[in-house]
Amino acid sequence: MRIKLIAVGGKMPGWVEQGYNEYVKRMPRDMPLQLIEIPMPRRQKNADPHKLKIQEGESILQSLGSGDHVVALEVEGKSWSTPQLSQQMERWRMSGQDVALLVGGPDGLSDACRARANQQWSLSPLTLPHPLVRVLLAEQLYRAWTILQGHPYHRE
């Protein structure tokens, strides 16, 4: 099973790449975490945010495999504790499907992306900056994996 983080945006600060990559290299070979960056359309003064969101959504959907289990990261989604995330991860692994985690642009995910999603997950009721989301996701996925392995990284 591969986990794909499909995120709108690019050119992250060095601390983001360093933090994200630290957890990517810790993930097991049979459950790699792959980042797919979707270029963000230029946002000009007169640009229609709704059209930009649709355009971003089309690019995200093109990045998906037909058999991917899609999880949209949405504020309105279901929140999981870290142990619950590890249980989700085990279910994903048992399904044999690749998992695609979708992170929208500044205006969120398009309706088409939300409709394609098998699940909606809320990391927090707070609005989180996109760079921080990448690092947070990578760390939480690694932490969930360590729970499944009985590794002492996670403590309750």
Swiss-Prot record:
Gene3D superfamilies: 3.40.1280.10
UniProt catalytic activity: pseudouridine(1915) in 23S rRNA + S-adenosyl-L-methionine = N(3)-methylpseudouridine(1915) in 23S rRNA + S-adenosyl-L-homocysteine + H(+)
GO terms for cellular component: cytoplasm
Oligomeric form and interacting partners: Homodimer.
Biological role stated in the UniProt entry: Specifically methylates the pseudouridine at position 1915 (m3Psi1915) in 23S rRNA.
Family: Belongs to the RNA methyltransferase RlmH family.
Record's protein name: Ribosomal RNA large subunit methyltransferase H
Source organism of this protein record: Hahella chejuensis (strain KCTC 2396)
